[in-house]
Amino acid sequence: MKACGITDVGLQRHENQDTFAVERGAADGQLIAVVCDGMGGENCGQIASSLAVRAFLDELHAVLRADMTTEQLREAVSFCVSKANAAVKRHAQEHTECHGMGTTLVSAVTNGSGAVICNVGDSRAYRVGAERLERITRDHSVVEGLIESGNITAEQARTHPNRNLITRALGPEEHIECDVYDVTLGADERLLLCSDGLVVTATDEEMYEAVGRGDTPEESLEHLLELSKQRGAPDNVTAVLLYHE
């Protein structure tokens, strides 16, 4: 598989606190992609997201093997998220100006014809199919809980006053629990990882249409960014697209 990514500060923020990376794994053709959306005063959100990305990747490279089973890969990803959490928390403890900083994380590690997906917070993973965009991850957020309890709709969640409140993040707590998913990909299916800066400005249907307008993966990402900016882009926008060559 191959991948490309895009990140932008948006139209209403002064600093981009999102970080993404794509690197090769241990197996032939294996890719690792990760997106983090940081939070914290001054530039601490950017520090949190970049620290988490680097720690997650470094730890994963140290344990990845080409012959890993899916279950072993799931365990490795969870372990590396805990290490990334410790790195962010340690920095906050050592630098008082960064107290309380944190970051979301969503990652994909390709594994043969599929991928192992992991998330903490409200950065998302989607499967881009032939007819629609299928959300893989569940947000760890206040509004997600309200949707699941039937108190609000998904459309209402996009403008809810508490839409930015997440219930899990790397950094604030000693221990973190991540959700891990196994995904099988068809020959024409792609994976989209993104920060909530994209999600709050467009519906899944609109995002699917924007991706479909691109003749290349890079153009698809440009269309997603353009869509977000047309809606005011109130937050940083980051997206990574993984696709078959």
Model segments located where?
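PP2C/PPM-type serine/threonine phosphatase catalytic domain
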Residues: 1-245
